[in-house]
Amino acid sequence: VDHGKTSLLDHVRSLGIESRSSVMDREAGGITQHIGATEVPAKILNELCSELLRGKIFDSPGLLFIDTPGHQSFSALRSRGGSLADIAILIVDITEGCKPQTIESMRILKESKTPFVIAANKVDRIHGWSASPGRSMAHSLQDQSKDAMSLFEQKYWKLVGQFAEHGFNIERYDKVKDFTKDIAVVPISAREGEGIQDLVAVVIGLAE
């Protein structure tokens, strides 16, 4: 259940704000029980992702993030959220892999033909992983030890296999050649805020 969706949204909400409001602290048992929305203007998105966008500018007014429940009990709300979204972020705990609600969310997205990106969360829980708050995942992957990267690769390829069983081709975001054929996976640490700009940059790319 706790794959880090609300922690990720905390970081999204805190973009451009010095003091982070913690949605996680306010929710009973850490479970999201309603659909909430957070709008992030283009100015903040462009500042956050300037290095990764390589001079490109996101022209839209901004992105509206809609928070849908991850708990298995809230299937109807999740279905509603999945069917009205232009793009979805599917969050998976990389240390645990797919859960029943992950599969259900994939089914909803497939049926509604909603493009989605996978956030492989909790990389900071991989043994030996060196997390740095706010760092891009592009830099983080270069700075990890061989042992940490070996464990990361094991968990990543297990995830690839689980998605393949349900007919989805997934690929690490920096290795995707064709976003119409492969679904991008962005490793992140929602707790540390690591890889958030990489994730947002991929969402911007899909939105354009």
Predicted regions and their residues:
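Short loop/turn elements that form and flank the Walker-type P-loop nucleotide-binding site
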Residues: 2, 34-35, 58-62, 83-86, ...
